[in-house]
């Protein structure tokens, strides 16, 4: 008798971009973060979740490359990580998300 592992995710997609967006939205809800943006080093938006301007927040994070900086009334947090020899930036408004569990989820999706 074999036991199948229990699937923890209730929302998933075989499409990479949609899966990244779902992952960001889940992180936003679980971590109580206003907005998340995932960008390239050049600040090009890959995906985002939340009410604020994803492209602008992501571009600021990729440019500043700083753990915390102010943008208007918001504190933004940028965290860089590598996937397939490409550096990406996860920028958040509200609280930092830079732990290995959160980043590992994004890396698994993007490595495919």
Q: Residue ranges of each PLM-predicted region?
A:
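Non-catalytic interaction/Regulatory regions outside core domains
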Residues: 1-112
């Amino acid at each position: 008798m074999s036991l199948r592992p229990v699937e923890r995710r209730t929302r998933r997609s075989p499409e990479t971009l949609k899966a990244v967006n779902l992952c960001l939205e889940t992180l936003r809800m679980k971590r109580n973060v206003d907005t998340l943006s995932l960008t390239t080093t050049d600040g090009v938006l890959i995906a985002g979740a939340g009410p604020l301007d994803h492209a602008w927040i992501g571009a600021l994070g990729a440019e500043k490359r700083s753990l915390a900086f102010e943008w208007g009334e918001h504190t933004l947090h940028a965290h860089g990580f590598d996937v397939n020899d490409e550096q990406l930036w996860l920028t958040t408004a509200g609280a930092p998300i830079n732990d290995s569990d959160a980043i590992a989820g994004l890396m698994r999706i993007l490595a495919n």
